[in-house]
């Protein structure tokens, strides 16, 4: 027999799913709108520890999945982590990569990440839309950041020339951000290698996909 607490949890989950379905249908008839956030807003939020919840246990699955893809497909390679924040993904990647470079537009977030810098791990303040990596990489990761760009497809395409041969792009997006339009555009432009949908018991869910930089359909 279902307990009251479990019934409430299930009701919450179904409500989230219904709300997401409505959002996705409405999105099909609306122009794409990115989440425009200024650097100082990011800095203020990180100073106020407003993003600390990203380190909660219910956020772990997407980080672990990205790390798993890199461990399986590009072990011992170089990683560019776009929008790295305080470097939570880097912690999951420790021991997997040869070189890691995390970039973020927030100075404050990188203050928290930089204590983990070493000879193979670096963090830089940069605008991802125009950043030029100092070396070619095996994998570029966009972990919950692509919907902050006004032109997300151009940003992904920007990094093509900085990927090594058979390099990969790994993208994670949370469903509450209604990224349907972005996923559709990516599938039309880039070659899919693999993908998975992750759902936590709280109702949070993400899609993580791996694209390859090779092929005529990569713009």
Name every feature range the model reports, one short phrase each.
Residues 166-174:
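Conserved beta-strand signature within the Rossmann-like core of class I S-adenosyl-L-methionine
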Residues 139-151:
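A short SAM/SAH-binding and catalytic strip from SAM-dependent methyltransferases
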Residues 199-219:
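Core SAM-dependent methyltransferase catalytic element
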Residues 86-130:
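Class I SAM-dependent methyltransferase SAM/SAH-binding core
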Residues 4-71, 76-85, 177:
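Conserved class I S-adenosyl-L-methionine
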Residues 155-165:
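A short glycine-rich, Lys/Arg-flanked "PGG" loop and its adjoining helix->strand segment in the class I
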Residues 132-140:
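A short acidic, Gly/Pro-enriched loop at the edge of an enzyme's catalytic core
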């Amino acid at each position: 027999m279902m307990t009251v607490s479990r019934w409430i949890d299930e009701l919450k989950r179904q409500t989230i799913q219904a709300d997401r379905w409505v959002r996705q249908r409405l999105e099909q008839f609306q122009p794409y709108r990115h989440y425009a956030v200024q650097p100082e807003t990011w800095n203020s939020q990180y100073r106020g520890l407003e993003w600390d919840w990203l380190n909660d246990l219910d956020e772990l699955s997407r980080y672990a999945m990205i790390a798993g893809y890199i461990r399986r497909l590009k072990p011992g390679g170089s990683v560019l982590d776009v929008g790295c924040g305080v470097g939570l993904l880097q912690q999951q990647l420790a021991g997997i990569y040869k070189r890691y470079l995390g970039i973020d537009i927030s100075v404050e977030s990188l203050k928290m990440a930089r204590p983990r810098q070493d000879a193979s791990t670096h963090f830089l303040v940069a605008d991802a839309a125009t950043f030029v990596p100092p070396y070619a990489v095996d994998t570029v990761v966009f972990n919950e950041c692509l919907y902050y760009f006004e032109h997300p497809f151009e940003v992904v395409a920007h990094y093509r020339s900085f990927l090594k041969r058979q390099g990969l792009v790994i993208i994670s997006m949370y469903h509450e951000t209604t990224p349907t339009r972005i996923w559709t555009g990516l599938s039309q432009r880039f070659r899919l290698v693999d993908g998975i949908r992750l759902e936590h018991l709280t109702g949070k869910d993400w899609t993580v996909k791996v694209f390859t930089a090779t092929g005529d359909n990569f713009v």
